[in-house]
């Protein structure tokens, strides 16, 4: 193999290694989460919000881990409904929240519920 061919092969291998490394970095980033505590004032209106958030959540790779259900609050106080949404990483969680699509949906949520939303990084 000529020196030019060896150099080209080395460059291709380095590119491939960089590609693999970037991929590993993406998969090893800590997950991002939205934790929401919600009091729903109008369940039919809140359903409109739930439908409106489907697209932005999907776009940013989110999945529901907790979506309502029974809960027990042994200390302090909490709203009636707890929602936990997982994102691939903290950046995706923040970008989804800041997205035009979600902000539009949030105006719907604000009409039909009162919520505390926290964005956190998991480990």
Please give the residue ranges for each predicted region.
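Hydrophobic transmembrane signal anchors and adjacent membrane-proximal interface regions, especially
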Residues: 7-8, 107
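Short S/T/G/P-rich N-terminal loop/turn motif that feeds into the first structured element of a domain
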Residues: 12-81, 87-98, 121-123
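Serine residues within intrinsically disordered or low-complexity segments
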Residues: 2-3, 10
């Amino acid at each position: 193999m000529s020196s030019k061919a060896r150099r080209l092969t080395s460059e291709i291998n380095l590119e491939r290694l960089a590609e693999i490394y970037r991929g590993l970095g993406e998969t090893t980033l800590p997950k991002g989460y939205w934790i929401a505590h919600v009091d729903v004032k109008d369940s039919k209106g809140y359903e409109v919000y739930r439908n409106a958030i489907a697209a932005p959540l999907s776009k940013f790779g989110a999945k529901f881990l907790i979506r309502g259900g029974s809960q027990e609050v042994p200390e302090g106080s909490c709203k009636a409904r707890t929602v936990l949404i997982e994102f691939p990483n903290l950046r995706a969680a923040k970008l989804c929240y800041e997205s035009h699509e979600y902000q539009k949906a949030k105006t719907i949520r604000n009409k039909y519920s009162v919520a505390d939303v926290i964005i956190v990084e998991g480990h």
